[in-house]
């Protein structure tokens, strides 16, 4: 597996970002060693906002994700650096405009194994608004169980692992799982085929923007009142 290390620098009012990829074994020990290397580089060179470890590196190491403030300007967000913290920050702000549903609405959601506990804790913030989202971590049998990111989860694995444990009225699918106009998974299965196999409404939701995610939930509730 590749872990992402994002590097960014600014000069003459222009900001550029480069990405450095290095192969690390998918163990907590190697991920921890990589994070330590990055921290030492920052300390030794006085470059606190120059190099960052991706969220996946911290998750693999079993370490707490950096805070929102520690993620800098999120210049490497496309490489997974600070992705969850920005989503969380925007999600919490968006809650201020979320109307309380007139009755309890329950949905299911799927994710990669590594981020599932964080998403589950975050979604509990929706309970006062009469919205319950059950998070189902999906082990990646298609690419190998050392692959734990959400964007590489396939429909076949969702069917095998979740078919008998979905209690909500719809299944939320993070948009990063989908390709080809947001309807095809990496294993070639379409969202309508997944819906037929699970006998569930499939609803695409944003996986990287907390504001958009809340809007997606509002639209789901309004269209299925």
Predicted regions and their residues:
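Auxiliary Fe-S-binding modules of radical SAM enzymes
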Residues: 4-225
């Amino acid at each position: 597996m590749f872990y992402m290390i994002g590097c960014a620098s600014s000069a003459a009012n222009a900001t550029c970002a480069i990405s450095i990829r290095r192969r690390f074994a998918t163990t907590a020990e190697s991920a921890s060693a990589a994070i330590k290397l990055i921290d030492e580089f920052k300390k030794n060179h006085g470059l606190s906002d120059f190099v960052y470890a991706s969220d996946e590196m911290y998750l693999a190491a079993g370490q707490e994700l950096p805070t929102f403030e520690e993620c800098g300007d999120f210049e490497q967000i496309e490489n997974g650096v600070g992705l969850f913290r920005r989503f969380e920050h925007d999600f919490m702000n968006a809650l201020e405009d979320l109307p309380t549903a007139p009755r309890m609405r329950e949905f299911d959601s799927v994710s990669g194994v590594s981020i599932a506990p964080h998403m589950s804790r975050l979604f509990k913030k929706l309970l006062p608004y009469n919205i319950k989202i059950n998070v189902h971590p999906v082990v990646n049998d298609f690419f190998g169980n050392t692959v734990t990111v959400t964007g590489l989860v396939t429909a076949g694995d969702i069917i095998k692992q979740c078919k008998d444990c979905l209690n909500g009225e719809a299944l939320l699918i993070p948009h990063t799982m989908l390709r080809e106009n947001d309807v095809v998974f990496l294993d070639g299965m379409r969202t309508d085929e997944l819906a037929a196999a699970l006998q569930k409404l499939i609803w695409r939701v944003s996986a990287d923007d907390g504001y958009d995610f809340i809007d997606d939930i509002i639209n789901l509730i309004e269209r299925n009142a």
